[in-house]
Amino acid sequence: MSHKYLIEYYEVVTKQQRTKQLDFFVYVDTVVFTINPDRLLEPEDRLEVLVMKRPGGAKGKWALPGGLVDDNEKLELTSIRKVKEETGLTLKPRDLHQVGAFGDPNRDDRFRAIAIAYMALVPHPSELRPIKYSDAASFVTYRSLRDNRLLEFDHSNIIYAARKVARGLLEDTNVALSFCKPKFTMTELRKVYESFLQYRVDPANFRRKVAATTDFIVPLEEFSDFGSAPGRPAQMYRAGKSDRLSAQIRFRRSLDKVRPTGTSRKT
């Protein structure tokens, strides 16, 4: 089909006719990750996802906050609006990272629906107050949501893809520090990584890689009893001046480690 023909075609077909011809709906769904501040929990149980229950939705199932894109509305603003309406959480454009598009013809049994997914990382909020279009909203552990029977549509696939994006951010940026207090120990930082990785990291290897990353963290002449060996206070750190890491920080799963109880290979 020539470029000239396409121009003539779209001059004739009205906006309403084009929408009808396409015959599908465009949604924005958002995956919001946080880390439970309870340091006594296992790292794999601290990663949580913001979910809600739709009025009239499948009984007992959660869904990601999301909805239809309004006319003349940017996708990012749809994400922010729907998260606010359905969970009470306020996001900003800089919080959002696009995950991808999900358009399996069978993803919604009501009609053809295309979802553009976004991901955000936020500190754990004190409470959630849905404004409308939601019967309930809560942060639920990522581990439990790996059971796709708990989620509507293909939202388990979206969450899994979003965690891969989050892991990429942890490898390339200092975003992990947003889940730490202004002063933190190496153990506290390592547990943030372990929460997103969903497996344990060798402490000595973690310390070596982090220490070798220029301007990532700065050691302090202060010590804490948390996150240290018995009788040995742990040194504390603060954030460095660099937002992007000088080198990627990656940690492979050790094949000789025992997989945590209740997990599957899809992590």
Feature names for model-found ranges:
Residues 11, 15-63, 76:
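N-terminal strand-loop-strand
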Residues 18-20, 106, 223-229:
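Short proline/glycine-enriched turn/loop segments at secondary-structure junctions
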Residues 24, 43-48, 76-80, 88-143, ...:
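Active-site segment of metal-dependent pyrophosphate-handling enzymes
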Residues 64-72, 178-179:
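Short histidine-centered catalytic/ligand-binding loop motif
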Residues 83:
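Long, contiguous binding/interaction regions
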Residues 119-120, 128-170, 179-187, 205-215, ...:
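NUDIX/MutT-family hydrolases
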Residues 191-200:
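Short helix-coil junctions and helix-kink-helix linkers
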Residues 219-267:
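Long, intrinsically disordered, low-complexity Ser/Thr/Pro-rich regulatory/activation regions
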